[in-house]
C-alpha cells in the first residue's frame, strides 16, 4: 500500500489494493514518511474507506486531533461493543472522535454545555447512557480529563445514532433529539 498524503504522524491517506483512496491510522504511521513511500501495514490500527468527498473531510478532521484522543475514542467504541454488545457503524469512529476533541477543548476553555435532554436520555436510553458513563471513566483514566455527566448523555446520543439493528421506535426518535442538541449548542454559542 502506497502513501498518497501525510496528514500527521499517525494518520495518512493511502491507495488500497483496488486503487481507491483510504485513510489509515496507527501510531507513528506517517512519521518520517513521504508521498510514494510504502506503508508499514503492521502499524495500521484502523482503515476508513468512503466516497472521495468524505475522505477530504476525514483528513481535515484527523489532522488537528491529538492521537491520544483518537485512541481513547477507539477504546470507548470497543467498550460499547464488548461490554454492552452494541453493533455500531463505522461512522462512530469519526463522530465520537470529533465530539471528544470538542468536549475537551470546551473543558479547557471553561465552557459548560448543559445537556437539556439528559433526563430523557437517562430514562429512555439507559443502556446507551451507561455506556456514556463508562466513556467518562475511560476519558478520565486515559486522558486525565473529568467530563460532566452531561457529556455522558452526549456520548450516549453518538452511540445511539451509530447503532445498527437498533429498535425502530428508538431510532425514529434520534433525529428529534439530534435536532434539539444542535439547537441547544447553537443557543449556547
Where do the PLM segments sit?
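A cross-family "folded-core" feature that marks the main globular domain of proteins
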Residues: 1-189
Amino acid at each position: 500500500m502506497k502513501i498518497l498524503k501525510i496528514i500527521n504522524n499517525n494518520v495518512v491517506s493511502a491507495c488500497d489494493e483496488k486503487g481507491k483512496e483510504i485513510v489509515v491510522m496507527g501510531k507513528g504511521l506517517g512519521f518520517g514518511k513521504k508521498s510514494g513511500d510504502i506503508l508499514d501495514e503492521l502499524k495500521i490500527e484502523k482503515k476508513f474507506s468512503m466516497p472521495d468527498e468524505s475522505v477530504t473531510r476525514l483528513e481535515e478532521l484527523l489532522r488537528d486531533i491529538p492521537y491520544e484522543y483518537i485512541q481513547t475514542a477507539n477504546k470507548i467504541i470497543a467498550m460499547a461493543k464488548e461490554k454492552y454488545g452494541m453493533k455500531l457503524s463505522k461512522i462512530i469512529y469519526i463522530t465520537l472522535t470529533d465530539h471528544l476533541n470538542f468536549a475537551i477543548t470546551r473543558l479547557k476553555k471553561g465552557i459548560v454545555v448543559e445537556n437539556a435532554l439528559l433526563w430523557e436520555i437517562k430514562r429512555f436510553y439507559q443502556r446507551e447512557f451507561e455506556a456514556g458513563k463508562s466513556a467518562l471513566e475511560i476519558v478520565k483514566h486515559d486522558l486525565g480529563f473529568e467530563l460532566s455527566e452531561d457529556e455522558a448523555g452526549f456520548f450516549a446520543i453518538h452511540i445511539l445514532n451509530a447503532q445498527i439493528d437498533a429498535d425502530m421506535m428508538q431510532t425514529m426518535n434520534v433525529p428529534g433529539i439530534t435536532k434539539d442538541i444542535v439547537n441547544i449548542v447553537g443557543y449556547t454559542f
